[in-house]
Design a protein with these regions (language model features):
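Core nucleotide-handling region used for phosphoryl-transfer chemistry
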Residues: 247-259
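Conserved short loop/turn motifs at secondary-structure junctions
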Residues: 93-100, 131-135, 159-162, 167, ...
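A short acidic (Asp/Glu
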Residues: 34-37, 101-106, 136-140, 169-173, ...
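General beta-strand structural signal in soluble alpha/beta enzymes
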Residues: 24-26, 65-67, 91-93, 127-129, ...
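Active-site phosphate/pyrophosphate-binding segments
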Residues: 121, 134-232
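Catalytic or ion-translocation cores adjacent to nucleophile or general acid/base/metal-coordination motifs
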Residues: 102-104, 110-133, 150
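Non-catalytic terminal/interface segments that mediate subunit docking, oligomerization
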Residues: 1, 5-88, 95-116, 204-215, ...
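Single conserved hydrophobic/aromatic residue that forms the stacking wall/gate
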Residues: 2-7, 11, 257-267
Length: 267
């Protein structure tokens, strides 16, 4: 079975093999803030970095990953422009923690959520915002999801909170391949990176697809249905198992915004 960080590497390899270039930028993206990625290996004697995925580079179809300076506004603005003029590539900007995206709020308001309406400018920029309350302090817990949801209108952006490796794989593959470019905001996991319950089978990557909603059926006829998203699902599931409750059904929302999400919730 695969954990989330492994699936993150798999989608990059698959996209490169399929001819889609990938570019990742963030303050700690090469190693990964939670020491989960390690896409650049350094020689301890020379300090030279080696990127294993670069072996899959073919001409302009290449993999690039950069550790950026500590200016969210500057880097996000640059990556927005990069994604806008480079439709064939998957461009990802990653906040070290989701909270830090507030420093770049002007870029989000002026360009990411409104450029299509104002100037007919499309962008497939993807934002990775590590999200979750794991006791790391008040500035390391929330990407202020409510602000992004307030900015949603007329399918201007996509907001997703995948909790399984297969979901991450299919979501980002879809973002790269889809010719209809829309900014994608992904609330990426923190503690779930190493949660043994948050794993996927290899077959889920090869045969599955991204699921907007995941329903965990109760063993008996359900008396209650609980709607949730993100890591809260695993907290609820643990409690259900601990109490041996068999009549509660959990419905997990993975796609929080596009009109498709609203239609599916109504159904």
């Amino acid at each position: 079975r695969l954990i989330s960080s492994a699936a993150s590497d798999v989608y990059k390899r698959q996209l490169l093999k399929d001819g889609f270039p990938v570019r990742v930028t963030g303050q700690d993206s090469r190693r990964g803030t939670f020491s989960h990625r390690h896409l650049v290996v350094k020689d301890q004697n020379t300090g030279e970095g080696f990127v294993p995925l670069s072996k899959l580079n073919k001409g302009n179809k290449k993999f690039e990953i950069f550790d950026s300076l500590l200016s969210e506004e500057a880097v996000l603005g640059f990556e927005y422009g990069y994604a806008s003029t480079w439709p064939e590539g998957l461009v990802i900007w990653e906040a070290q923690f989701g909270d830090f995206v507030n420093v770049a709020q002007v870029i989000i308001d002026q360009f990411i959520v409104s450029a299509e309406t104002k100037w007919n400018r499309l962008s497939g920029l993807t934002l990775f915002l590590p999200h979750g309350y794991e006791g790391q302090g008040p500035e390391h817990s929330s990407c202020r999801l409510e602000r992004f949801l307030q900015l949603c209108a007329h399918d201007n952006i996509q907001i997703c909170i995948p909790t399984l490796p297969a979901q991450i794989f299919h979501l980002l593959r879809k973002q790269a391949i889809n010719p209809s470019r829309k900014p994608l905001v992904v609330l990426t996991p923190k503690s779930l990176l190493r949660n043994p319950q948050a794993t996927s089978k290899i077959e889920d990557l090869s045969n599955g697809t991204f699921r907007n909603i995941i329903i965990n059926k109760s063993k008996n006829l359900p008396k209650r249905v609980v709607f949730c998203s993100g890591k809260v699902f695993f907290d609820l599931q643990d409690e259900i198992n601990k109490l041996k409750v068999k009549n509660i059904e959990l419905v997990r929302f993975c796609l929080l915004y596009t009109s498709d999400a609203a239609d599916e919730m109504r159904r």
